[in-house]
Amino acid sequence: FGDLAREDDRYISSRTLNRLTAEIGVKPEATRVALHRLRKEDWLESAKFGRESHYRLTNKGRKLSREAAPRIYGDTFDRPLWMALYDPGSAAPDGLRILSGMCLVAQEQKGAMNVALDHPLPQWMVGRLVDQDVRSAAKNLHQRLQTLAQISDLSNLERVVLRLSIVHEWRRIILRVPDVPDHVLGDGIALRDLRQSVQHLLAVLSDVSLDHVDDI
């Protein structure tokens, strides 16, 4: 929904949703459970058209999807960062805490030793900021994207499913990574290469829309 129906209030039918989820091996019962949970959490709302249920994002769902969109679809960016070494007994500055007395900050901190971050962080620091399961997921996704064959001959259904799968997996990774320039994380998680692969494939699949889905 956040990829195909973020900018409008169009519904997606339960038939279409079941076709999409079946293509990736999700059973109808699991789809129903997921839809129920998303409705309960105020992400989705439903309506009956004839005998069939249709779903769309709620106002909350659209708002949160739009807020997350720059991180999911946008480029990385460069901005100055400092490693602030401060008194562990004092209040921590606003930033990304690595250890007691050590924090990544967006501006120099008074009373701290501020070291401009010109190089990637060592892997042990990246490990403090990004969980191992996220780093493993990023590596795994990048490897799989590199092995994708030509996608020009895919059917409309396959193109929709491929795009949604890429967005889903990338979203689960990038939203659990600190919002810092990709190069800061260095080899600890090869985010720059993965982002380039994701953006390339999403550009190739940029023609995918609800119009294609409705025609399935």
Please state what every model-predicted region is:
Residues 1-7:
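Positively charged, polyanion-binding regions of nucleic-acid-associated proteins
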